[in-house]
Swiss-Prot record:
Source species: Arabidopsis thaliana
Subcellular location: Nucleus
Protein name: General transcription and DNA repair factor IIH subunit TFB1-3
Residues annotated as domain BSD: 107-161, 186-238
Coiled coil: none
Disulfide bonds: none
Stored PANTHER family: TRANSCRIPTION INITIATION FACTOR IIH-RELATED (PTHR12856)
């Protein structure tokens, strides 16, 4: 369980914002500020008592935990339901500790986890929602023990994974402006499918949108209304009708936030320009501008992307979007937050940007040193030797002038002057020698049997042809994208669950102990339950999607069938051996 709280060491303490993570054996508080050293870890069996404010007492929802050492830990929650949920969770954990007191004193070697390893396991479960689902499904249901579950993930718990986890996660190369909605031809409505990855990318590329979300949601509008206005502004951008955009911006001040230039990005650009070499002549690049020529320029949605000076406040260019998108992709994921709460993601990203901004600011001494170093490297024209250029510097406005001037030079060169001479006889000899070797020794046996490869090829051909008929000609669209979100998540979860079960099943053979026999029996029952869930899922989907879902489910059922067949044959062999 995880809740957003404010930790207080005493009553009048202003508090530290962070997240409270609860398990049956430990309570962990992690502050939002990554530079803060305030981290709290409390063993559940060390909690002596808990006090809380009553609902309706005009006091904030506080939960005061007192340890057996006499220390008080006060947590202020956002609302009373969160506080009551945590209080009930701690009460159940304390009751379990009282029922099994021996387990608190005498621990098996597998249960004697160090604090660092426990924190790492907790961190992995918190950051990986799919891993958390598997842990809840198999460990809490007693199909696997805690030790068995983590035994197949030693790389995640090793030192190498700790070092690799510091690497920043990348972002997809797809631009935010390239998100296309689905259109309903009957109601003339467009629907955008927003995922947590897309929301994070929007917040990273557009700081003004991120700040507007923090300011407006939920004080002035709901999250749905916010994204509706955002995509309305994006639609106005795509139409290139600046007059309509200006009119709607004048009537709706919230919509105007998305249409105005991003002041946060402009401020960041001004700060970056202070670090640019002042001797750099950026006007020299103007001669490379070919966008005004025929057959040149950048096309966007079928028309040239040109900004008119009088309307540049209400229109972005494709170059601006590309440059910003490239900068965000190169920067990577600067925060490590996996949460369904959009506000948590926005606030965490804002804090990370503020920290990086503070780290990147140039101090006065560093700026002075940079200027002095550049002044020493700057050349003075009157002290340099005269440079007599044989030709005048080129400033080509039209590339055709260059290519037409080079055509005469090419025709004047003797034919074949630069052509490399190939030894035809040598190549023929090598080819003839290779053919003789094949005739003498013959070809080796194929790695894959022809009938197997033909069956796979035929299956792929049927699948691809069926998918093309259903999905159309859009290569970026997959069948999973057409499924309802609940069905898509269910298919993915079943696939990861089956992988987990099958991995533990096959690693338990050969069965040499009673422990392995019991473990295989539990896994077999869990796989049977999953098999029935797959059949139920196939029957529950729409009729037009049932065939494609069956194709997705078929490899899962084949993997389970192979495990069942091996289980039955091995059980018969062991039974016959005993009798």
């Amino acid at each position: 369980m995880e809740k957003r709280v404010k930790y207080k060491s005493f009553v009048k303490d202003p508090g530290t914002l962070g997240s409270l993570e609860l398990s049956e054996v430990m309570l962990l508080f992690v502050p939002n500020d990554p530079k803060s050293d305030l981290k709290l870890k409390v063993q559940t069996h060390n909690i002596k008592s808990q006090k809380y404010t009553k609902e309706g007492s005009n006091k904030p929802p506080w939960l005061n935990l007192t340890s057996k050492q006499g220390r008080s830990h006060i947590f202020e929650f956002e609302n009373y339901p969160d506080m009551h949920a945590c209080r009930d969770f701690i009460t159940k954990a304390l009751a379990k500790c009282e029922e099994e007191p021996n387990k608190l004193v005498v621990l098996t070697p597998a249960e004697q986890l160090s604090m660092a390893e426990f924190e790492l396991r907790f961190k992995l479960l918190r950051e990986n929602s799919e891993l958390q689902k598997l842990h809840k499904q198999f460990v809490e249901s007693k199909v696997l023990t805690e030790d068995e579950f983590w035994s197949t993930r030693k790389k995640l718990l090793g030192k190498d994974s700790i070092r690799k986890s510091k690497q920043q996660m990348g972002l997809k190369s797809m631009m935010v402006s390239g998100i296309k909605p689905s259109t309903d031809g009957r109601t003339n409505r467009v629907t955008f499918n927003l995922t947590s990855e897309i929301i994070f990318q929007i917040f990273a590329e557009k700081p003004a949108v991120r700040q507007a979300f923090i300011n407006y949601v939920p004080k002035k509008m709901t999250e749905k209304d916010f994204w509706t206005k955002y995509f309305r502004a994006e639609y106005l951008y795509s139409t290139k009708n600046t007059a309509v955009a200006a009119a709607e911006a004048a009537e709706d001040e919230e919509l105007a936030v998305f249409l105005k230039p991003d002041e946060i990005l402009a401020q960041e650009a001004r700060q970056k320009m202070r670090r640019v070499d002042p001797t750099l002549d950026m006007d020299a690049d103007e001669g490379d501008d070919y966008t005004h020529l025929m057959d040149h320029g950048i096309q966007r949605d079928g028309t040239n992307d040109i900004i008119e000076p009088q309307n540049d406040q209400l229109k972005r260019s494709l170059l601006q979007d590309l440059n910003r998108h490239a900068a965000v992709v190169l920067e990577g994921r600067c925060i490590n937050v996996q949460s369904e709460d959009t506000r948590i993601v926005a606030e965490a990203l804002t804090r990370a940007k503020q920290v990086s901004k503070a780290d990147g600011e140039i101090t006065k001494d560093a700026n002075q040193e940079r200027l002095e170093r550049m002044s020493r490297a700057t050349e003075m024209e009157d002290l340099q030797a005269p440079q007599n250029f044989p030709l005048a510097p080129l400033s080509i406005k039209d590339p055709r002038d260059y290519f037409e001037s080079q055509q005469g030079n090419i025709l004047s060169e003797p034919r074949g002057a630069k052509a490399s001479k190939r030894n035809v006889h040598e190549a023929y000899g090598l080819l003839k020698e290779s053919i003789l070797v094949i005739r003498m020794t013959g070809l080796s046996d194929p790695l894959i049997k022809p009938e197997v490869s033909f069956e796979v090829f035929s299956s792929l051909t049927r699948t691809i042809s069926t998918a093309k008929n259903i999905l159309g000609k859009n290569p970026q669209e997959s069948f999973l994208d057409r499924l309802p979100k609940s069905t898509k998540d269910e298919v993915i979860h079943h696939w990861t669950s089956i992988q987990e079960l099958v991995r533990h099943f096959w690693s338990s053979y050969p069965i040499t102990t009673t422990y392995l026999s019991t473990k295989v029996g539990k896994l077999k029952d869990a796989m049977s339950n999953t098999y029935s869930l797959l059949d139920a899922m196939k029957q529950s989907v729409q009729s037009d999607l049932r065939h494609q879902v069956s194709l997705l489910v078929r490899p899962m059922q084949q993997a389970l069938d192979a495990a069942f067949q091996h289980y039955e044959s091995d059980l018969q062999r062991r039974t016959a051996k005993i009798t």
